[in-house]
């Protein structure tokens, strides 16, 4: 019995250009991304820092394609899980051409990293477009609240006064004062 292989690609990189969106005859969206990943190392002989950038062709289909076309821009950092696919076509002069792409279908993943407004801006941004600034020292005696990096600011009123036991409540801290 022949065993199945594994075809899974995971990339974290930055877009080299805005997403290119097309629509299939059935109305489904298709987006092409040009994704750069970089490796850095130190040359053992010279001690110089070296960097190599690889460019990856990424294709997204369906709802992920629509989201990518709306929110991603040149410079956006993105996490991709997909599969390698090689396709063949014939160009206008009759020459057969091949290209290998990372295809992200319904079983794949595309996750935006670095916040909504981080792409293309000259200023380093924190999650959700908030500039990173050191926290002001707290003098209240209470421990400072910890906010994970990619969460929106807590500037809205909470209508839910409690959460049932057994449910995790992200972004909330419970203090018992006696």
UniProtKB/Swiss-Prot annotation:
GO molecular function: single-stranded DNA binding
All residue ranges annotated as the SSB domain in the record: 6-111
UniProt cross-references to Gene3D superfamilies, sorted A to Z: Nucleic acid-binding proteins
Keywords linked to the UniProt accession: DNA-binding
Pfam families linked: SSB (PF00436)
Range of residues in the leader sequence: none
Start and end residues of each stretch annotated as Disordered: 111-161
A GO BP entry: DNA replication
A GO cellular-component term linked to this record: nucleoid
DNA-binding region positions on the chain: 55-61
Subunit structure: Homotetramer.
HAMAP family, A to Z: SSB
Annotated PANTHER family: SINGLE-STRANDED DNA-BINDING PROTEIN
Protein name: Single-stranded DNA-binding protein 2
Record organism: Salmonella typhi
Source organism phylogeny: Bacteria, Pseudomonadati, Pseudomonadota, Gammaproteobacteria, Enterobacterales
């Amino acid at each position: 019995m022949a065993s199945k292989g594994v075809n899974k690609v995971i990339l974290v990189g930055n877009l080299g250009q805005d997403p290119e969106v097309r629509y299939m005859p059935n109305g489904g969206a298709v987006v092409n991304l040009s994704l750069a990943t970089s490796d850095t190392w130190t040359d053992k002989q010279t001690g110089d820092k070296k960097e190599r950038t690889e460019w990856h062709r990424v294709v997204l289909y369906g709802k992920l394609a629509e989201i990518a076309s709306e929110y991603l821009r040149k410079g956006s950092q993105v996490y991709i899980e997909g599969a390698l696919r090689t396709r063949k076509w014939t160009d206008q002069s009759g020459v057969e051409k091949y290209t290998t792409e990372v295809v992200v279908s319904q079983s794949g993943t595309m996750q935006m990293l670095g916040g909504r407004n981080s792409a293309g801006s000259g200023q380093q941004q924190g999650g959700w477009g908030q500039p990173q600034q050191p926290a002001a020292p707290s003098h209240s005696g209470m421990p400072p609240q910890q906010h994970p990096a990619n969460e929106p600011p807590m500037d809205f009123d909470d209508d839910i006064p409690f959460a049932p036991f057994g449910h995790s409540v992200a972004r909330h801290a419970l203090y018992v004062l006696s």
